[in-house]
Amino acid sequence: MRYFLLPLFILLFTQAFSQDIQQVEVIKSDKQVTELFDELGDKEIKIDVIDLLAQPALNIGYEKINDSYSSFGADLYLNLNDISSADSWAEKISLNPFYRFYFLNKTDFGGEGYFVEAFLKLSYLHYDRDTYYYGPDPGIPYYESEEIKTFDVAPGIGVGKKWVNRKGWTFEYMIGFGRFLFSDFEPEATFKGGVSIGKRF
């Protein structure tokens, strides 16, 4: 009897365990992912809340989801600070097209999880440049202030992460850096990043 009960117990346990496994689907197929983000929409509008609260500046973005693994879009940055403000960036207006590659945490909705972004900043810069000079007495320097207005281009790369809920609301953070190509006088490096809230449609 003992030898009969042991195989029976193993059989029942295995069947119950198999039923549990069948009820849990850990990874969705690409077709299911596509259906889910088609239901939510494959376009997204977002706004950077850090720029809005801290600068003030307006940074709005648009993103088009290609598939589960990639997207492209652009964001527009408008600096609302006065150029004399200590908090102001040199960039007054910036249009930033980008292309993203999503990886690791690709989940239900596509275009979600960790990403790497390649971007190109097309920037109009407006700032005051101070040039210091030394006369006969090196202990008494003097300087000239010059208002600079110029246009420049900065390629760059960034990393970040995005979350999407079942209502289509998105939350993301990102940090990236680029380098201006042409001018010798403006800041050589440029920053791109922030914390954004958006909506799929």
Regions found by a protein language model. Name each.
Residues 80-84, 105-107, 124-130, 165, ...:
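Gram-negative outer-membrane beta-barrel proteins
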